[in-house]
Amino acid sequence: MLDLKIVNGKIIDVENRKIIEGDLGIKDGAIIHMGHVTAQSRKVIDAEGHYVSPGFIDIHMHEEDFTLTKKQEYDISATMLNMGVTTCVAGNCGNNRQSIEMLSEFIEEKGNPVNYMSYIGHNYLRNQVGSTDIYKRSTMSQIKKMQSMTLEAIDFGAVGVSYGLEYCPGIDLEEAIEITEHIRGRNDLLLSAHYRKDAVNALDSINEMAEIAKETKIPFQISHLSSCSAFGNMTEALKLIENIKLNGIDLSVDAYPYAAFSTFIGSAVFDEGCFESWNKSYDSIMLTEEPFKGVYCNREIFEKARKEYPQMLAVANVMNEDEIVEALNHPMVMIASDGIYRNHSGHPRGAGTFPRVIGHYVREKKSMEFFDAIDKMTLMPAKRLKLKRKGLLKEGFDADIAIFDFDRIIDKATFQDPQLRPEGIKYVILGGQIAINNGNVINNTLGRFYKRGEA
């Protein structure tokens, strides 16, 4: 007796780039039969007319902040589930919003809408050891402490180390390398970074990240290239990364499908000179929380928000969409949301990225190929994270599945209402159990915390 059977679906074979018309048989959290499945099942989903995809994997997003949710509600985890994501990677851009141990304990105790893995963030570690001036290098004593804390996090099960170089200008190249003292050369880990500077400085930033990868001898993920290089130099940036890879440095890249980025208004991203670099003005910045929710800045509001509300999320409409599409289509680039919310406010990418890619760029604009898009949201990130049982619909693999209506799938979240649910996601299955049934969330506690190597 099967636990769950999905029948009459258009099963996406990502590896062979084809559609298999048929069924999936699921038992004990895994796919055990494919094709024409005759075995009886406790539950049956009729997926006729719908695509059956591996659950989407978001390799770059930003987890809940328990100081805001008080551990009483789900924020971004809920929006991830709504768009068909089944596994996420937290702790990006150098920033853990709480300790990895706390995140793990919360999920193991209460469950979660989606599965999580996590980096340990360099910027987070700096705060833990008292290196709180973002414009100053850490002392050698602080670096020694961070070296030990990095190893402890890796031993606990962290994916690797993430950096927020732009957020903390005091992190120089030497410090970024030095904190990896006890983990260098480990091919089972992954480093990632939010670049040093964007736009006219993007190529220098890419070279710096390549140098970190070279010196640490650890595979490296360049985060959200779209917000680094979609200012007139995306072609050059992609070519540079290709050449770096040809020289034996293990780099990969992710990007999100929006021409605006989001971060805290008080961050160093908005330091003096940013508008000149982007060739934009104050009115390209929209604030997302009261007392300025939905307000586009002038100089006075911009400076007031930076001073009085530094943790407020802002949206910067400063990138070129044609270069976003160029990045999304490049063979090295996988798709990730970079989603982040504060009190349910923020950027719509955290609720719309994956449906937007399929609905807008594949179906409507025809600027991406279907199998390429699915690969970039499933198998590519699974391989990069060394997930042995995720990213494919295959016998023996985890039954993490998204079922969608290709004709209807689309993002609905906006900058004014950034957590609106997408359309077209019919079912989501985590570990063989139904989380979303016929478009309705029926179980939001199926997710678990995976330590590195467990999935």
Please give the residue ranges for each predicted region.
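Active-site neighborhoods of metal-dependent hydrolases
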Residues: I134-M140, M146-V159, Y163, S223-K366
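Divalent-metal coordination cores built from histidine and acidic residues
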Residues: V52, M61, K71-S162, H182, ...
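Histidine-rich, glycine-flanked metal-binding segment
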Residues: M1-P54
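Acidic, glycine-enriched loop/beta-strand segments at the rims
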Residues: I12-D23, A314-V318, I324, M368-I374, ...
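Divalent metal-coordination and catalytic microenvironments
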Residues: G9, L24, G29, G49, ...
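Histidine-centered catalytic micro-motifs
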Residues: G55-F66, L165, L191-K197
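Structural preference for beta-strand elements that scaffold enzyme active sites
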Residues: T87, P113-M117, A158-G160, D188-S192, ...
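C-terminal cap of metal-dependent C-N hydrolases
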Residues: V318, V325-M332, S337-D338, I401-Y450
